[in-house]
Structures are given as structure tokens and as C-alpha cells.
Amino acid sequence: MQSYLDKIIATKALVVAEQKAQESLKEIHSKASDSSPPKGFIDAIRKRDQQGLVSVIAEIKKASPSKGIIRKEFLPEEIARQYERKNATCLSILTDEEYFQGSLNYLESIRASVNLPLLRKDFTIDEYQIYQSKAYGADCILLIASVLTAVSYTHLRAHET
């Protein structure tokens, strides 16, 4: 019997295949190379630690499979600016469309709205998504160990940008 996570990963594989058909790995790699250097996600956390402060990675999420719509009036750029004003250390942006109603466009528009380091929170299963994350403004990505084999984890780490 397929678990819910297995279903999500199968859907993600189809989505990534569609994205690759629309924009090649070479094209997205080029966009990633042309994008701004990443902001220091870990450096931001270390700086807070050195100041004796707690780091907060604030999440921007419209919905979840278990809770449904979390925030009906969802203005991701405004939420990001509010978090920045309240001194969040970094932001975590949900980009999975099918199950969390996220979007890469949220990541891109938030990048243009705030100066904080951004984490793309998605089900990363392919190197394409690493370059895509950078091209859309992410400073780091989430890798979920339970969906990756040791080999695929090592392969994805080899494509750090």
C-alpha cells in the first residue's frame, strides 16, 4: 500500500518532468548561474547565536493536506515583510503546489520583497529543483531524508550551487 508521502513524491516526479519539458536543465542552470549570490542562511543563524539570541525560521504556508487552508487571505509578500519587521532570522517558503498550494512565484516575489535568507521548502527529489530554487531566489533548500536514498542524497549534495 502506497503511503501518503509516496503519493506526494510520485506527484512531484511528474511535476518535475513537466517542468523539465518546459525549461531544460541547461536553461534553468543558466538562470541559476545568473542569479544573485545566496544570502548566508547559516551565517544569519550563527550571527544570532553569537549575539545570544534565538533564531527564528518563520514559515510562509498557505495550506497543508492535514489542515486545509491555513490562511484564507494569503499575501505572501506582506507576510514576509511582517516577519522581517519582527526580526525573523530566515524565512521558509512552501512551494509545493499540489498539496500545500505553494508556488515558485511566491519564492520569487518574496525574494524581491525582503532581505532575509530564504529556504525553499518542497519535496526535492531531482537536481533540476536545486538549480530552479536558486533561479527563483532561494538561498537554501530542504532535503527530506526519508524520501531520499543515500545515493540520491549524495547526488543532490553534489549539485550545491
Question: Where are the language model's segments positioned?
Answer:
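Glycine- and Gly-Pro-enriched alpha-helical subdomains that act as flexible
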Residues: L116-D126
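Glycine-enriched alpha-helix->loop->beta-strand junction motifs that scaffold or abut catalytic
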Residues: N87, V114-L116, A135-I141
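Short beta->alpha connector loops at strand-helix junctions that form conserved
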Residues: L94-T95, K121-D122, L143-S146
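Catalytic cores of alpha/beta
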Residues: E127-Q132
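Short glycine/proline-centered loop/turn elements that form peptide/ligand docking sites
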Residues: F100, T149-A150
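Conserved small/polar residues in nucleotide/adenosyl-binding loops
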Residues: T154-T161
